Amino acid sequence: MSFLKQTSYGIILASLFGLIAACSGGQKQQAQGNTVTTEAAPKQVEINSEAKLLIDYLAANGDYVNSREFPSLISAEPAFEALGEKTLVVDIRKPEVFKKGHIKGAVNVEMPDLPGYFAEKIKPFEYDKIILACYSGQSSSYATALLRLMGYGNVYSLRLGMSGWNPKMDNKWAAGISSEYESKLDTTTFEKAPAGDFPLLNTGKTAGAEVFDARIIPLFSDYENATIAADTVFAHPEKYYIINYERKDKYDTGHIPGAIRYKPGGTLGIIAEMQTIPADKEIVVYCGTGHNSAFVTAYLRLFGYNAKTLRFGNNAFMHNKMIEDETTMSWQPYRKTDTKNYPVVK
């Protein structure tokens, strides 16, 4: 056979092999002796119809959890500067606590009554800001998330609550910080659970707005079931699916044993990510202070997850470490100097 013919046959064979390789693109091949096996891509898990209606409804109505406004927090200083006719402060603490001292002009509305108050007692959008105040900023963050999801885009949670407003208030933050479990921190990277379905909501509704309405109001009366203490979690961390809602470098420096990192700004409202949160387990969400995790918990509970926010976040179990690494890791450890001395009235 001539060199030209050999070259022609070589080109033809090479082309055929190239075509075969191109046709198999996107599939993983494994050579086993003379046998080539092909692995198909994992089958995508569909979510139930009501969960799909709800997530599509929220995405079409502002997609709050993936907006710049999430989470909607305001610190004491800008809150104080904003006080006036165009700012309404809604204090959600118990009436007997409210009477002992509150921000001037504040109204006292407990969390279960918030939806009715916003719908019937005020015209919310006449205000530039509506600031929710509680004891430590934990419950007000949860309630703010729910109100924001309802479309009230001018609601904010007072960071640190009344504990950060005036030193004479009952300082829940001073009582909530601890370094008790620093020696138990883990640096292992844990993987997310396999994808599965969202929780079944069973509202019987067939439109996204209807599913949302059926789910959102009861959550205002369920906050007591939406929180958990560090002592409880560290006693049996294996009982929970623990979500670390922090930057990767903060996760890597030490986290609750078994905790899995979920990316802030890359989890909520994203079906593939939320599918890895087990529908049949108790979920614990934590961050640095408990504020962000309260927002996340409210959203997850809307979808039927048995989620709980860890009160005071990392401050509740690794406070000393947060202070030591504050500069390098940009932690937010609570200090008594974080509490301002703004006026209160009775």
PLM region descriptions:
Residues 1-11:
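Bacterial N-terminal signal peptides that target proteins for export
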Residues 38-48, 85-98, 239-251:
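Short, compositionally biased "basic patch" segments
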Residues 77-85, 232-236:
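A short acidic-Thr-Gly-centered motif at the start of a beta-strand
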